[in-house]
Amino acid sequence: MSLLAQLDQRIRHHGGLIVSCQPVPGSPLDNPAIVAAMALAAEQAGAVALRIEGQANLQAVRPLVTVPVIGLIKRDLPDSPVRITPWLEDIDALAQGGADIIAIDGTQRQRPASVSALLAEIHRLGKVAMADCSSLDDALECWQLGAEIVGTTLSGYTAEETPDEPDLALVQCLSVAGCRVIAEGRYNTPAQAAEAMRCGAWAVTVGSAITRLEHICGWYNTALKAAVYPANEQ
């Protein structure tokens, strides 16, 4: 049975939650052993797959879990805004680290390696390709180029301002177009994740709301301060 067929079964049985275990950089939780523990806990809690950044984290996670792992490498490049798996050698590193699915930036921006070249390398290594996209045009082009999965990962993150709500409209458009779409980006409540599935998502990736303690505490702190000190009293 293919990896995607196995994931189809997991999604039907467990509900389609993918957990992204990516601590805030520099956080006390930003340690491969801790990332691996979070990943194992997520699997035991019913996650159908995991999203793991960096070769060291991937190598720590892979021996502990049985669910598929989406691997990526983030880089800050001086000559390109593309951060997610920008180089061909990143794909080789992720494959060697045990990633089942390799995520790349699928946007139409200046980049060191073309989307088509990255997809070809993923497939040469026998892995499944996921394109993290920001728009309908991005995603449809990546789908046509052969990405087995498209994600709404970068919707709202390539402009100056990031909206608070997830892009459910993009999920629905991609589903209608026949794409296998993972809803990702600002799915901070179970209700939002459920709505994404109703809009046609194949699965939903949740990160900050589960694995970024600093973000969760920040949401609570903001709400509590607003309750104790209303705007007109500050």
Curated annotation (Swiss-Prot):
Q: Which residues form a coiled coil?
A: none
* Listed Pfam families: NanE
- Molecular-function annotations in GO: N-acylglucosamine-6-phosphate 2-epimerase activity
Q: Name one GO cellular component term.
A: cytosol
Task: Determine if Cell inner membrane is one of this entry's keywords.
Answer: no
Q: What class of enzyme is it?
A: isomerase
Q: Which pathway does the protein contribute to?
A: Amino-sugar metabolism; N-acetylneuraminate degradation; D-fructose 6-phosphate from N-acetylneuraminate: step 3/5
State the UniProt keywords alphabetically: Carbohydrate metabolism, Isomerase
Q: What is its EC number?
A: 5.1.3.9
List the catalysed reactions: an N-acyl-D-glucosamine 6-phosphate = an N-acyl-D-mannosamine 6-phosphate
Which CDD domains does the annotation name?
NanE
> Any one Gene Ontology biological process term?
carbohydrate metabolic process
Write out the similarity annotation.
Belongs to the NanE family.
General function of this protein: Converts N-acetylmannosamine-6-phosphate (ManNAc-6-P) to N-acetylglucosamine-6-phosphate (GlcNAc-6-P).
Query: What's the name of the protein?
Result: Putative N-acetylmannosamine-6-phosphate 2-epimerase
Q: Which organism is it from?
A: Klebsiella aerogenes (Enterobacter aerogenes)
Q: What is the lineage of its organism?
A: Bacteria, Pseudomonadati, Pseudomonadota, Gammaproteobacteria, Enterobacterales
Give the encoding gene's name: nanE
